[in-house]
């Protein structure tokens, strides 16, 4: 059968045994990829500095998903939190990866078995002996089993009743760890940033799935509904399955890009909106003002700011800064963060404190402007020095660092002041090692950006797939045309109803 590449799935259209085989093989490939990718990531991952060199800066993609489900230790003796471990147990990163590879092998063998032994009695209607599938019953079975799995995950794994719990952190991504979660049954459960909603929604959705599965197993669909929704056609199953998948892809694209309890910033990096809204900057300022109010010096106040919080407040960690087609991890762009230099305070020769205006997300270059507390521009780094009125040299700007590695150091020479003004544009000032990875200085996106981009495209593609296959199954009679096996000659005008020999027109 000479089929073009885009029609090859026709071979399993009326072959339930081999339909199962190709699904088993597909799951084997997915499971095998996940396990192999996990082992690769573990082999290149550097766990030594979870603060300045976290997994999302290193371009890890599957490790964050394993971690959010409760896997934090390695057979290599390290933990995701940076400490050493002596007994990681079976369910370490390597253990989970190995389990996926073993599952892949088992599924591979099952796929071969079902491809060879495709013509099973199970797939034949006992009344007619013809191949037939009871699709509404199969739907009920799948709904029941997926509901059971969903309920089990929410009631046991997430709550810690029989499992580790999930990754839970504070809004600023400082204190994250794997812990049991109490289900949230009130309105607070609908807050996308409340981990309690993950437990309660899985429990509720699981119960609904179990009940719906039992309903579809015990109640047959009405004949008219069966025919109207083409429930006897396996392409209907394909179309509705694609609909479920594209909807899920759209939803997870949103929860990943905008952030949620299921996508913690410690594992996937900050969102672009946290930079746009000055989320971390405001929290840092609040903490500093609190320390100053309690009598601390400016140096002490800034020294109390966690380095982790400062690092989030850096534009290079914004997933929207990396171009979609710039391959590589964030560390391949601006380098590996080596240390926080401190908070720079700029002053002019009159003693006015100046603030560097931060670069917006969608700018590659932005003028370096230093404004006073009223927002008036007092100094800048001009594009054309001949026309400059507010240059660093003319205004006499100096910079003093508080907290960090340069605590208490003041720079007066214009070239150094301009260097730190340019870097203050990008948020917190950090020193980067660009030599180790031969980083090119061009920002990259985080796994948050890759996941969103990939799943949005998958969702769009699958949306059109749903429309295509849905139209094919609903309008199958139209596309199929008139049955060539009709004994009577069919012609327009011969019958009142085309092809119905009982409605032959009488000659006048």
From Swiss-Prot:
GO terms for molecular function: chlorophyll binding; electron transporter, transferring electrons within the cyclic electron transport pathway of photosynthesis activity. It is found in: Plastid, Chloroplast thylakoid membrane. It holds the Pfam family PSII. GO terms for cellular component: chloroplast thylakoid membrane; photosystem II. Binds multiple chlorophylls. PSII binds additional chlorophylls, carotenoids and specific lipids. Keywords: Chlorophyll, Chloroplast, Chromophore, Membrane, Photosynthesis, Photosystem II, Plastid, Thylakoid, Transmembrane, Transmembrane helix. Its main location: plastid. The chain crosses the membrane at residues 21-36, 101-115, 140-156, 203-218, 237-252, 457-472. PSII is composed of 1 copy each of membrane proteins PsbA, PsbB, PsbC, PsbD, PsbE, PsbF, PsbH, PsbI, PsbJ, PsbK, PsbL, PsbM, PsbT, PsbX, PsbY, PsbZ, Psb30/Ycf12, at least 3 peripheral proteins of the oxygen-evolving complex and a large number of cofactors. It forms dimeric complexes. This is Photosystem II CP47 reaction center protein. It comes from Nephroselmis olivacea (Green alga). The gene is psbB.
């Amino acid at each position: 059968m000479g089929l073009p590449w885009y029609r090859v799935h026709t071979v399993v259209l009326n072959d339930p045994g081999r339909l199962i085989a190709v699904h088993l093989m597909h799951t084997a490939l997915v499971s095998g990829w996940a396990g192999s990718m996990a082992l690769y990531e573990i082999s290149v991952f550097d766990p030594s500095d979870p603060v300045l060199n976290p997994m999302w800066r290193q371009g890890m993609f599957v490790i964050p998903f394993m971690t959010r489900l409760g896997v934090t230790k390695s057979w290599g003796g390290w933990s995701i939190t940076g400490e050493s471990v002596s007994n990681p147990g079976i369910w370490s990163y390597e253990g989970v990866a190995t389990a996926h590879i073993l599952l892949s092998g088992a599924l591979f063998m099952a796929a071969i078995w079902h491809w060879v032994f495709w013509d099973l009695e199970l797939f034949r209607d006992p009344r007619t002996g013809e191949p037939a599938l009871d699709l509404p019953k199969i739907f009920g079975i799948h709904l029941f089993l997926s509901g059971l799995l969903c309920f089990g995950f929410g009631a046991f794994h997430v709550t810690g009743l029989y499992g580790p719990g999930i990754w839970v952190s504070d809004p600023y991504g400082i204190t994250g760890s794997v812990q049991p979660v109490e289900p949230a049954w009130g309105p607070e459960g609908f807050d996308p940033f409340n981990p309690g909603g993950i437990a309660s929604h899985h429990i509720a959705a699981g119960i609904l799935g179990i009940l719906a599965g039992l309903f579809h197993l015990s109640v047959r669909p009405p004949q008219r509904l069966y025919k109207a929704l083409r429930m006897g056609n396996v392409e209907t199953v394909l179309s509705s399955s694609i609909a479920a998948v594209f909807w899920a892809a759209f939803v997870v694209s949103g929860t990943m890009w905008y952030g949620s309890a299921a996508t913690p910033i410690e594992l996937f990096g900050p969102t672009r909106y946290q930079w746009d809204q000055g989320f971390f900057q405001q929290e840092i300022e609040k903490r500093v003002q609190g320390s100053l109010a309690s009598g601390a010096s400016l140096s002490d106040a800034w020294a109390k700011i966690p380095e982790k919080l400062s690092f989030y407040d850096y534009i290079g960690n914004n997933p929207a800064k990396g171009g979609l087609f710039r391959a590589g991890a964030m560390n391949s762009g601006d380098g590996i963060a080596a240390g926080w230099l401190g908070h720079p305070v700029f002053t002019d020769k009159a003693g006015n404190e100046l603030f560097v205006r931060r670069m917006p997300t969608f700018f590659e270059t932005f003028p370096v402007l230093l404004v006073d507390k009223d927002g008036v521009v007092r100094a800048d780094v001009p594009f054309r020095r001949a026309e400059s009125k507010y240059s660093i040299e003319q205004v006499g700007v100096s910079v003093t660092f508080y907290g960090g590695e340069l605590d208490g150091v003041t720079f007066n020479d214009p070239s150094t002041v301009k260097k730190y003004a340019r870097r203050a544009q990008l948020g917190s000032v950090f020193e980067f090692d660009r030599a180790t990875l031969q980083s090119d200085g061009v920002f990259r996106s985080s796994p948050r950006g890759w996941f969103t981009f990939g799943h949005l495209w998958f969702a769009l593609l699958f949306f059109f797939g749903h429309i295509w296959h849905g139209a094919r199954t609903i309008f199958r009679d139209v596309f199929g045309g008139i049955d060539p096996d009709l004994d009577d000659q069919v012609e327009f005008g011969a019958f009142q109803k085309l092809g119905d020999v009982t409605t032959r027109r009488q000659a006048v």
